[in-house]
UniProtKB/Swiss-Prot annotation:
Protein name: Protein VACUOLELESS GAMETOPHYTES
Span of zinc fingers (ZZ-type): 24-81, 83-137
A Pfam family the protein falls into: C1_2
Designated gene of the protein: VLG
Positions contributing to Zn(2+) 2 binding: 102, 105, 122, 127
Length: 248
């Protein structure tokens, strides 16, 4: 039986081979740090745990984005300057895999945040919300998310209705879409409701993937904080032991 052909990707030193993810696999993509869904590539070396969604494999190397019009964003396969993580300038969460980056401005965006929809319908507001890339008020004013009541940093992306001065950060809108998708992808009735057509099911699926990404990034941030605290405690314990030995 002939073996499946292998392919190369600039993010990894070894050849990759195509596979189809199973629900029970629980494997993390090395590009976006999310659970593998659908088609993916795996390193041909048995001892190498490198996995990549086909969608991450196919990401363009350079893009232009409305959030950063002055310079192109370049796809990086790991954080800059040998850092283990970066902070996304769209949602404010950590990332450790692929990022779209402007080295001139030190601007980073998750590969998932780059593709969020430009408009979003939220059940708590009558009008569609438009994606904007900073808070719609002066920096000395406080802007609060109308969904979760959290204060929103001025430099992060949000969904906003200018007519009503109603805004919600990415997490709030995406969390609602995730709940809708769990219930079968159905939105509100009447005009703009999903009604079960294929286009809205696809949009719901994409928003569900984004919600999973943001959830994974928040969990990663918590793990990194816990690891940092553990390292600090270890350093303190080591210094204490040295001090005790000097006293003996």
């Amino acid at each position: 039986m002939a073996s499946r052909p292998s392919v190369r990707h600039p993010s990894h030193n070894h050849p990759l081979r195509g596979h189809k993810a199973q629900v029970e696999d629980e494997i993390i993509c090395s590009g976006c740090d999310l659970d593998l869904l659908g088609a993916y590539f795996k390193c041909t070396k048995s001892e190498c745990d490198y996995f990549l969604h086909k969608s991450c494999f196919d990401l363009p190397r350079e893009i232009r984005h409305k959030s950063h019009p002055d310079h192109p964003l370049i796809l990086l396969y790991s954080p800059q300057n040998n850092n283990s993580t970066y902070t996304c300038d769209a949602c404010g969460e950590y990332g450790s895999g692929f990022t779209y980056n402007c080295s001139i401005c030190q601007y980073d965006v998750h590969v998932g945040c780059v593709s969020v929809p430009e408009t979003m319908k939220h059940d708590e507001h009558v009008h569609p919300l438009a994606l904007i890339y900073k808070a719609p008020c002066p920096k000395d004013h406080i802007f609060t998310c109308d969904v979760c009541d959290e204060t929103m940093p001025h430099n992060l992306w949000l969904y906003y209705c200018q007519k009503c001065d109603y805004g919600a950060h990415l997490h709030s809108c995406v969390a609602e879409e995730e709940e809708k998708s769990k219930k079968g992808g159905r939105g509100r009735g009447g005009e703009g409701g999903s009604g079960g057509n294929g286009v809205n099911r696809g949009r719901s699926s994409a928003n569900s993937e984004l919600a999973a990404m943001l959830k994974a990034q928040r969990e990663m941030e918590q793990m990194q904080i816990a690891l940092h605290l553990e390292m600090q405690r270890a350093k303190i314990d080591k210094k204490s032991r040295k001090h005790m030995l000097k006293m003996i």
